[in-house]
Amino acid sequence: MTQENNNSTNLKTVIIPFHEFIANELGNNCIKPNDEILTVLLKREEWEGHEDGGETPTELSDRVKNWQPYDARKDRQQLTRVEQIQYQLKYGVKSLQLILGQAFYRISLVNAIMHRQYEQGVKVTSRGRAKNILGVVKWNATYWPQYLKYYGFSGILNYCLTVLDYRRVFQLSVFTIAMGAGIMRFGLAQKLTKTQPTYVISAEKFSVQPKSKSEQNLLMEKVFGKKLPKALENPIVLYVEPLGLTNIQLRDEGTKEITNYPFIGLTPETLTTHRSARPMVPTYEGLEKFDADYLKAIRAASYLIDQETLKNVIDTGTVSKNSIHSPNFFEKVDLNFFEYEEFDEKTDNNQSSVQELSQFFNPKMIRTLSTEGISLGTQPDWKMAGPKLQTNTLAVNDVYPLIDKYWSESKADQIHKTSADFQLENSVGKLTSAAYRTESEFDFNDLEDFDGLEVDEWDDFYFDRKSFRAKTAERENEKFNEFLMQTSMDELGLYKNGFPSLELKRINENLTKEQFKDLELIGGLLPSIFTWYAFYTLYQFRLNYIYNVRKKPEPILYTRLDHFGRLQNKVKLNEVVGIDGGGEAFDKLFSALQRARGMGLYLPTVLLTIWESSLSPLIPGELDNWLLTQRNKVRMNFIKHTTSKVDFLMPEVTLAQKMLSDPDKTSGYESRFHFLTHAVDSAINKMDAFEKSNSKMLSNLELTLQESKTKMSKIRHLQGLLPIMKVKELFKVTLKLLQLIENELSHSPVISALKPGRYGLNTLPKGMLLVGDPGNGRSFLARAIASESRLPVFKTESTRFLDVKFGVMRLMSLFRRVRDQAPGILFIRDIDLITIDRERTNSPELIQLTTQFLICFDGYYIGSEARPTQRKIFTLGSVSDITRMDPACLRSGRFEWVVNLRKPILGERKFLLLQKASQSPVQIDATIAWNYFGLMSEGFTNAEVVSIVNNSTLQAIRKNEFVHTNESLNEGLNSIFQLRWNQTVSKAADEGFFNELHLSEVINSNKLTVDYTMNEKERPFKTKCMHLLTTVKNWSPKNNPTEISSLRMQNIGMSIQTQPVDYSQELIVELLDFMAEGAFIRQLRRCSPANTFVTQTSYSGQLGERLNKTFLKGCLNYRMENTLALIENPTQGLKTLSGTISWEALNKTALKDLQQRTALFTSWYKSRMFCQLKPDQRSLTNRYGYNPNYQQTGSSSMNRFKDRIKARLRESTHQAHPLYAMSGSIRGTFGSRGYETRLQRPLTGPVTQMSQEFLNIQFK
């Protein structure tokens, strides 16, 4: 087979599965007018040119142009909101088909030219390829914005839907948006100038690694010229090859320096064969290479537009200004721009190449496909290029009055009101009216870089964003601040009826011409909304197909939709389904790990991450139906306030965020305190009631937005990415509001919803141990944590380090490589083999290995220098027996978190059996005695329980019965017994044995639900990983009682515990969060079993405050105590807490009220911290000034405050603790000085007394 045919076959293989996916999966849910369009586009002949039987470009454009997806009999204005949404869904898939087909049709033109050139006898060498593709390269770079404008979006999207499993599409969402924005910027650079040192090479067979000096010089000469231009310090070359990253080395002839340039690949042909090509899915091995370098290259690509360079190009007249912004730009471009003189003049391929280019790249045809072909609207007065979102796009008729007002005086004769002229310039992701700009009015400052995806870690890569934008920051601030004073989010209509809209008909008429230009940048939302809309359409049809057509519940992917709309609303999993079986410990772990990547915390638990990362979900149908009901309940949160009739439920991404609403025109409390409205329905209702009862007080509240430094940051504010920076006069209602939403926020970190992404791995312990027998999911949980955190994962076996000669060297090399890729996760299996207790072994090699591990674990890994590294990594270790480990590994500061992965109990085994059987390819007999098999599998691990069903499936298929029976399950049970103990379970004599068991279960009404005997109030997930979400336990005191003394010594040396929180440099909102932590910390017991997690040094929320064991039993830590004590002093404390807030605005009444209620809050809380203290500890020595060895500090007001607390504690010394259901005797430390508490007897009681006392507090 020739090389050409092989390429064509590969292309065909890539494309056809998408058509099959649409036809098979969506079926009759998609209306199919002119369905032959897609069929023709996907023909093999089409990829080799229309001469081989495909449609001509004119026929294709006419067919697409005449297709009318909407009902022409109905006028757009007559459709209700529900009907509009229904039409969007009805034709969404057909729209996606056309867009993807158009994108691949255009890409095929480049391939066709290359194939034609190869057929003409051109030698397949690096020199020949470079010479013959140069015209295509330059043409591609010039026409990129219109010719391949959907390549970064639809091309990758289509590939994800075809080659990859469609369930993984959501993992590529971030990659798609970032890559799309980067490519658009490349297109703009090449469109404006020939000398910009950024080229797009679209040759499939072109070697990217010059192997000789001649090839290297040739590539430099053909692509960059004689030597690298000095206009750009960090040139990037896009190489349209596989989805991977490679490097190319180019030497500057002037300086003789060799530089590595990253190459970014996009085409799908070689993904499965190229080892460096990795999709955006967690692969756990080699992820560090892809994650770090690839995304950095994408980030670098997004900054290639230099404003000064563009200005110089225009000033020098390299390219005509009119041709850039004229709607007839494609018709004015001269084909001589391809510069064929660089081809070999001795060959006669030049003329034929010109003819091929003219034939395939007809500018009129390209423009037709770009503007008309993918426009889904039928009304001639409101079409626009790009995907049509119906009412969520810019209606030209609505803009005419606005434009007339701006331009009527002097520019009326230049206005051409044609729908095609008003189009989307995808090259920069901005909305611009090309027909309404003249040569003198174009301002290149409008080309502010548009970030495809904002990720904090990438900000300083290649360019300093502050200096990059500082040139126009002052002018933009002044201009845009004036704009914000005259309009609001509601007036812009960007969030009309809870749906992201771009209708501009409600714009304030007082806007100036410059402000209108700024307003056009809001069009940067369009690429994201389109990408979100495409995924959302597929998701909705997938959902409808599963639940209405096949009638078989299956796992549904819905989570990552909030990437596309780029809105801030993130629905926590515990808000959707209630209690998350992992408790707050896992929330904090996942939250901190994910913040290290700069992304928000969307779903802080394991379940749906396992779902998304292609691991076995094992979700039963009845549970999934229940989850769907809860999701719908959350989606209705804001929609029910804006529409009276809603037949369709919007996803979480479209929940409205009116962060900039005018307080005078918007009475909704959620618009001014949006950070409090991330709870569920009951929280919103309570806040609404509170607003009505405290309207006078709320009228004095004021929300001040921090002034933005750049125009695009303000645009992001309009998109819903605006964080709350300053809140004045808020403390007078803080405690009351916290009480109203306390129960709703009890299971989710408050700070996580307010300020995600601020703190990183330095707030975490260094490691966590996964303890349990093999087969209970230690590696499974490690993969789930890695997938949720989105961090590079390094997996290794501890046996690699047991080598006597190279073991220590390998260990040092491992930590060095991991820290070079920090932040990341290191997972070591059977870590107890390299952390043997040094007192129990005489082997010098094992002693040396354990010592070296501790040195590397603490960060002292660089040679012999005893200095710690600042690169943070999180170490996960799996161990079967923790008693074999060295006590030094379990002390505070190292492996502080321990997860015990126990064997499943009876209820879990029964549920796991039924769950696995329901997902097997065979049926289930209704007479199976599940209780019997659950009892007989006592002591089995989770893997062995699943193996019972697997063996039963094989038995059923072998007997050609295809049904699970009692006999087949019994065979599976026997196989496990035979393997473990070399014995079998006695078989039943006849069917009567199992029938009798089944009848007994029916009579006793035994339900197949999980039996949780630890805590009846807990409702964890019914899933395979429920046994993984066990509580974090403190193993160190249990196995090493002598560690308490050393731990106390460690705590004494922690100076951080002796200082109050310094909020002079922090935001006032964080003080609110900190107080909120104290308000809801007593709810921690609700999300964990009776044996709650106890850590040597734990952490609370994102503020990074050090807690301890006693605090988790109900105590505020030392820093919080000092902070709340400072609040009591209104003259010093408040100024200390935040020096940037003008506290003079708080009147005397508010200060007095805050002082009284803060003292009541603190004293009441502390009076119930301890149920019984030791006799020598009842005076709270080392804490309130009664220890003679403790030197008192602070004012007399502080001492009086301590005396009141001491008196309250004396009164409640022998009272039962009313807050927590605890049992057992627990020893621990408290604060930095260290003392012990002992709980003498079990404690019970709800959290009613404290809540009632707070609710009785009245504002004066």
Swiss-Prot record:
Sorted UniProt keywords = Chloroplast, Plastid
**Cellular localization per UniProt:** Plastid, Chloroplast
User: Where is this protein primarily located?
Assistant: plastid
Q: What is this protein called?
A: Uncharacterized protein OtCpg00170
Q: Which GO terms describe its biological process?
A: proteolysis
One Pfam family from the record: AAA
Give coiled-coil spans as residue ranges: none
Recorded GO CC terms: chloroplast
Which GO terms label this protein's molecular function in UniProt? ATP binding; ATP hydrolysis activity; ATP-dependent peptidase activity
Species name for this entry?
Ostreococcus tauri
